[in-house]
Amino acid sequence: MKFPNAQATVYNDTVVRQFAIMTVVWGVVGMLVGVIIAAQLAWPELNLGISFLSYGRLRPLHTNAVIFAFGGCGLFATAYYVVQRTCQVRLFSDKLAAFTFWGWQLVILAAALSLPLGYTQGKEYAELEWPIDILITLVWVSFA
């Protein structure tokens, strides 16, 4: 039932759209790296003798890109879309939502640069160095 004087809520779909687009972009990048390392299993010479193109350096990049970049962006997009509509309110702060978007993209970019260069903690699914971990914490706390 609609009330005659009720105003329609205007949602912040900008951040939802940004995260949705980057979900596709990072999904393609992550899957492409996966195809490259799968091909390297059959043809090891595909790394061209370049250390940052080796299987051992690209595999952490692939797993982190698919889990954190693709999965994380999809999670943020879904959460920002669903919460606004189920609660029927706009996001608390557009600037905070923008920070989560740009902060998360910075996390992904830092991971994409550091992992092939070999800067890791050497722990499966927790390879990222501590400065990136701090940025991840800041983004997730601001999201909460």
Model-derived regions, located:
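Hydrophobic cores of alpha-helical transmembrane segments in multi-pass integral membrane proteins
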Residues: 17-119, 130-144
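A generic structural signal for ordered alpha-helices
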Residues: 6-10, 53, 122
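Cytosolic juxtamembrane amphipathic/interface segments immediately preceding
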Residues: 4-18
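Intrinsic disorder/low-complexity signature
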Residues: 2, 9-10, 59, 91
